[in-house]
Curated annotation (Swiss-Prot):
Main location: cytoplasm
The keyword Cytoplasm belongs to this UniProt entry's keyword annotation: yes
Classification via PANTHER family: RIBONUCLEASE H2 SUBUNIT A (PTHR10954), RIBONUCLEASE HII (PTHR10954:SF18)
Keyword set, alphabetical order: Cytoplasm, Endonuclease, Hydrolase, Manganese, Metal-binding, Nuclease
Protein name from the UniProt record: Ribonuclease HII
UniProt record similarity statement: Belongs to the RNase HII family.
EC top class, as a word: hydrolase
Annotated gene: rnhB
Length: 194
């Protein structure tokens, strides 16, 4: 008998701007998608194509986020766990077991769950969740780039690259920036000194 399992993964823990995203995916027993692996190992074009196929073929999927404000109030780890719980709670189908990428399980899940280190390369449901979380996170960065092209979010996806840090210094901190992350926090502290 097939056990209905969900895979859960996150995207966007490290960037200096934007939400952290999590996805939960339940795949049908017969699901087969060649090339599906950890989203970080895929080109953006391949990820986007796979995301559409996953959404079409999954038994259930849901993408959730925790905002920069929630990241600031909870810290990035707890905000990530919150996004993961929201993703699981948003599934239209209730899984019997959950596999979560990493070494931690969100609190207050009422479904048996197991953390799997490097699960996005080992368990297909986690690989699928990895792709959906990453494409949702990238979509947020493209939308932010439309509103604030001078920051280059479409290129660096919010990570603390030289280009991003220079834009921060030149144009200032946006409401979407994570004020508790050191480069942003340090810049804000410098600005209050002058």
């Amino acid at each position: 008998m097939h056990i209905l399992t969900a895979g859960v993964d996150e995207a966007g823990r490290g960037p200096l701007v934007g939400s952290v995203f999590a996805a939960a995916v339940i795949l049908p027993e017969t699901f087969d998608l060649p090339g599906l692996t950890d989203s970080k190992k895929l080109s953006e074009k391949k990820r986007d194509a796979l995301a559409e196929m996953i959404k079409e073929q999954a038994a259930a999927w849901y993408v959730a986020a925790a905002t920069p404000e929630e990241i600031a109030s909870l810290n990035i780890l707890h905000a990530t766990m919150l996004a993961m719980k929201r993703a699981v709670d948003g599934l239209a189908v209730r899984p019997e077991k959950i596999f979560i990428d990493g070494n931690r399980i969100p609190e207050h899940l009422d479904i048996p769950a197991e953390a799997v280190v490097k699960g996005d390369s080992k368990i297909i449901e986690i690989s699928a969740a990895s792709v959906l979380a990453k494409t949702a996170r990238d979509a947020e960065m493209y939308a932010l780039a439309q509103r604030h092209p001078q920051y280059g979010f479409d290129k660096h996806k919010g990570y603390g690259t030289k280009q991003h840090l220079e834009a921060l210094k030149q144009y200032g901190v946006l409401p979407e920036h994570r004020r508790d992350f050191a480069p942003v926090r340090n810049l804000l502290a410098q600005q209050t000194l002058f």
